[in-house]
Amino acid sequence: MAARRPRTAPEHESDDDSYEVLDLTEYARRHHWWNRLFGRNSGPIVEKYSVATQIVMGGVTGWCAGFLFQKVGKLAATAVGGGFLLLQIASHSGYVQVDWKRVEKDVNKAKKQLKKRANKAAPEINTLIEESTEFIKQNIVVSSGFVGGFLLGLAS
């Protein structure tokens, strides 16, 4: 912001003070988020580390993410499958009666709502996809290491 000169009592009523207007969107485009967090000397990984280091960093983080995804996925699949199995047993035993027409009506209603929301959210999703592909293009070595590590983490 522009500096203002100190005001005295008579100047307080005058409207001749000038201010500089800053465009925050342009500022944000020029100053990436990592510069605000980590300082001016930080930047894209490509400029800082060797190819081997980038592959190892991507591979290790990918393996950790894949391993966690596998464990959480197994737990979620077990919970959903177990719940479905219990509902089937209860249904066949006569404890639960399913109104299939109502289920079909609710599913169709949910489909319509999802289509409406998907059409509204399309610009934000496209922007996110564009930013992600740009990041992957700029950091292809780290990204490929991450994908490889992720697949290894899923397999282990």
From Swiss-Prot:
Protein location: Mitochondrion outer membrane
GO cellular component: mitochondrial outer membrane
GO biological process: autophagy of mitochondrion; response to hypoxia
Major location category of this protein: mitochondrion
Transmembrane segments: 49-69, 76-96, 135-155
Motif segment (YXXL): 19-22
Coiled-coil ranges from the UniProt annotation: none
Keyword set, alphabetical order: Autophagy, Membrane, Mitochondrion, Mitochondrion outer membrane, Transmembrane, Transmembrane helix
Origin superkingdom: Eukaryota
Pfam family, one: FUN14
Membrane topology: Multi-pass membrane protein
UniProt entry tagged with the keyword Signal: no
Role this protein plays: Acts as an activator of hypoxia-induced mitophagy, an important mechanism for mitochondrial quality control.
Family the UniProt entry places it in: Belongs to the FUN14 family.
Protein name, entry field: FUN14 domain-containing protein 1
Native source organism of the sequence: Gallus gallus
